[in-house]
Structures are given as structure tokens and as C-alpha cells.
Swiss-Prot record:
One Gene Ontology term from the biological process aspect of the record: isopentenyl diphosphate biosynthetic process, methylerythritol 4-phosphate pathway
InterPro entries: Dxylulose-5-P_synthase, THDP-binding, Transketo_C/PFOR_II, Transketolase-like_Pyr-bd, Transketolase_BS, Transketolase_C, Transketolase_CS
Cofactor: Mg(2+); thiamine diphosphate
Keyword set, alphabetical order: Isoprene biosynthesis, Magnesium, Metal-binding, Thiamine biosynthesis, Thiamine pyrophosphate, Transferase
Enzyme class: transferase
CDD domains in the cross-refs: TPP_DXS, TPP_PYR_DXS_TK_like
Protein's UniProt name: 1-deoxy-D-xylulose-5-phosphate synthase
Pathway stated in the Swiss-Prot or TrEMBL entry: Metabolic intermediate biosynthesis; 1-deoxy-D-xylulose 5-phosphate biosynthesis; 1-deoxy-D-xylulose 5-phosphate from D-glyceraldehyde 3-phosphate and pyruvate: step 1/1
Amino acid sequence: MSLDISNYPVLAQANTPDELRQLPQAVLPQLADELRGFLLKSVGKSSGHFASGLGTVELTVALHYVYNTPFDRLIWDVGHQAYPHKILTGRRDKMHTIRQKGGIHPFPWREESEYDTFSVGHSGTSISAALAMAVAAEKEQAGRKVVSVIGDGAMTGGMVFEAMNHAGDLHNDMLVVLNDNEMSISENVGALNNHLAQLMSGRFYTTIRESSKKVLEGMPVIKEMAKRTEEHLKGMVVPGTMFEELGFNYIGPIDGHDVDALVETMRNMRNLSGPQILHIMTKKGRGYEPAEKDPIGWHAVPKFDPSTFEKPASKPSNPTFSQVFGKWLCDVAEKDDKVLGITPAMREGSGMVEFSQRFPKQYFDAAIAEQHAVTLGAGFACEGLKPVVAIYSTFLQRGYDQLIHDVALQKLPVLFAIDRGGIVGADGPTHQGAFDLSFMRTVPNMVIMAPSDENECRQMLYTGYCYREGPTAVRYPRGSATGEPQVEEMQALPIGKGLIKRQGQKVAILNFGTLLADVLTAAESIDATVADMRFVKPLDVELVKELASSHDLLVTVEENAIMGGAGSGVLELLQQLKQPMPVLQIGLPDEFIKHGASGEILAELRLDAAGILEQIEEYLK
């Protein structure tokens, strides 16, 4: 997307932070306006994360203006809000390629730019990384500064407080910017707090504060009284006592859309010693009315025309697997008030909006705290309740210890509805659901199911709901289901039993999951037998034995890492049965899968019908 200089006269002079820092401070408000306008048009053409970036425009300008990036380290938590950062760090003309195959990465990415000092995608990691860089900077003694930017949502994660507790103890110089976009800030409160922040971060206040500490070192009783008095006085006007208790000097809250106030406050804070936290108030979706009114709905958008003030109407399609899950959850909750739905801050994405509205007392949003969400489910199961933990595959990784220690070890009947299993597409390697079958297979007492369509998904969810001998997992992909007519009656499936979907000869394909349609298409060309295995664990032992004894080659197909996945389970079983035979494993390779459209990625990995057939024919040569 080339830049029309007539529409962006200041932005045209700020293609890099070095150029930005040459501009007079007086033009920064205009730069912010132009940057917001450019972001609006570029995301409209490319699709992508939208509302978060609109809310961090002034912050991004101020950070790169005050800090000498990339020498000074700037770390963005999660990265949804980093589009303005990408625009100002030499990637402006490539923004139209973001999240597309071969285009720039959806999140800050070390391989992409020296300004992206830490690759991100999951929340709550920035302060730990920043602390490490601050320790390294102190050892280096080159005057390097370190800044972490984290949103208020990520502050619900336990890792954040672990890092802050450690930072307060080590006391290295670092700044944490808390971007609080839960509410807009009124003009009066904004003016008051902007003034207080500049006063409290200024040289006069901090000199008195530090000098007083030195004077009182030998008088611990008076020192403690003075500390409590300071905290009390600050607590009367600012909500920072909690951060002070963790060892941080708290400044704020200030208006995160006042670029001049941000610059002045950061200039003051740049020279403060020890860990600092700057609390700013922003509005998600700032500058675009529909996104301001509905920041969740405009969090990520398809391609759209900003001038219409609405997203394009979605084309009629089959329901998504997330919607299938959400409807199933409502169906069982209508008949059983012991059913509880748990999500770690993914209500919309997991299809739980209707459930949360209809059954508010049975709905629990654990916030961005996957470990807590899993153990919350374990506790409910201990009391005879029926917890369903709806979680993305990539985020279940964060609750793996709890899955083992708190759920499986105690054989607790917790049902895991695992969304985004397999290729998720545009969000890239931090979000692909590549590993869940592999890491769950190793856990004793687990029952793992992979549906081939939405009806199997409903039946498997019901199977997990009925199963009381231990934890169960139903793993399904992102996106639309296959369009199978819904079977209303739900019946529990026999545990560990698959189905023959096509009878052939010589080659038997064991399918795990929603690639079944492609597998059946490939099988037609070579007259292969196709089995819908349904259960990854326990495997259908009798079916595997039968197929192995009547065919020359077994082929396993899964949208999961080959290493340790369902195919590995088949190989292990054959070894136990002392029934060795050729097995071709088809799945995700031993690499992190890059971003792009899901269909493009599956084709590139040869996991579409043509690719599956090609791999089998190559093996048979």
C-alpha cells in the first residue's frame, strides 16, 4: 500500500523511528491522526486485528519518540496492538500483506524486524522478557532502556504477577506501560492525572523521595511510617498501591490519547531508577465509531470499506464448529443444571455467548488464566458438578501441568472442548493447534476424540459429558463444519471404537478428524479402505488389527504434529501386537507452521485430497 503524501504529509516523514525522532514535538498530534487514518485504510484492505491498534496510536508514537529504539528494547505483550508499531518501523508499505501467506507477520516477530525485540502471540510474557533484558542491560552498562507494553486483560494472568514480583525484588531499571482500555477517561480526570503523573515522575519529587529514603535508612521505624504515609497519600488519588507493594513505582493513570502528556511523562520516567509502571487509559477502537461502540466485535475484521461504517455481511455458510459446540452446550444445560461452562477469556471465539446469556450462573470466565481455568474445572468435578472447559488448542498448552496433576491424576470427569485444533491460518505459528493430540496422548486416564463432522462432534461432546471415569477431550478445528444435517438425538459413543467408511484393498487409511472428506476423495483414486477412527485414545485395537492383517500398507492422516500424534499411537500399538508392517504417517511436519489462509497452508503441507494422494503414491513407488 503506497503512501499518498498529500493525505499523510507528516507520516511520510516518519518511516522509521529515527525519522520520527527528528520531528518537532508540536507535529506529533497530527502524526497520530495520520497514523490512525492509515491504519484504518490498510486493515480495511488486508483484514486483521483492528480495534486494539486504533487504541495505541498515541502511545506508539510517544514510545518511539522518547526511547531510542531499537537500541532501547520495546516489548509488546500479545501483539494485537502493535500494528502502529509495525507502520512506524519500516513496514508501512507492506501492511497490506499482513497475516497473508508470504506477508508480514500478524504479531511482533524477531525474524522480521530488529524493532521486534521479542516474538509474541500469547499473553502475559512481556514483563518476564523485559526483566531479563533489563538485567542484561545493567550488566552491559551501555545505558540501554527496557519497556514492556501490556494490556489490562493480560494482567489477569498469573505469569504477569510472578514476573512483577521478581522485578520488584531485583530492582532493575525497567518501565511497564499498562494500557488500560476498559473505560474511556473524562477530560477532568484526565487533566488532573496527567498533571499528577508529570509531577510525580519529575526530578523534584523523585529527588526528595530518594533523598528521604537515604536519610531514613538508619531509622527503620520512621522509614516504615513514611513509606505508609506516602502510599496512603498516593492511594487517595491513584489506584497504584498494589503495584507499589510489588516493588514498582506507580505513575498514573493518564490519558493515553494525549501524546504530549505521554511524551513528557515518559521523558521524566526514562531516567528513574528501579522498576516503574505507567498506567495509561485508552479507548479500544479510538477514532472509528463502530469499533469504539463494539470493540469486541471489531477486535479482528475481514476486508471492509471503512467509509460504510460496517463490516461486510458474512456470506451464508455452514455453522462453525465453535457454534456447534455452543449450541450443544445450551442443549445439555437446559436439561442439567450441573453442567458448567468454563472459558479463559474466549467467550466469543469459543461460541459461548448464548450460553453465558441464558445460563449466567453456570458460566465462568476465568480470564486469561488457563492454568486456573483447568484446575477450576477439576474442583467443580470433585463436587459432583459437570464442568466443560472450552479452550483453544494453543492455549491448553499453558494448562498442561494442571491437566496432568489436577485432572487426570485424580481421574476427574472434566470435559475439554478443544477449539482451533490443527491449522488456524492467519494468526500463524503462535496459534496453530499443532500439538494437542501429541501432548494429551501421553497423559494416563485421558479419552481423546477427534470428530470428522459436526454430528460426530455433538455425539462426542455428549460422550464426554456422560463419561464419569476420568477426563475426556473433543478436539475440533476452526471454521465452518461440513454441512451434515444435524441429528437431534444424542447418544454416547462406545469408547474406543471407529468405523469403516469405505472398503477397499491393499491400502487402508486411518483418518483422525475433519480431513475425512479429503481422505475419501484420495481413496477413490487408489481404491483404498478408509476408517474414521474417531478415538485417538484409546485406539480401536480390534479395528487396527483387522486392517493391518488385511492390507499391505496403513496410512494415518491427522491435522496434528506427526511426532507423537495419532499415527505414532498406531505404530506403538502395532509394535505391542507384534504385528509389524509399513505405516505412512501424514500430518504436520516437525516445524512451526507459518501464517496464511488455512486452505493455502493445508495445500502446501499436502494435507488436501491431492496432497494426501500424492504422498501415498510416492510411498508406494
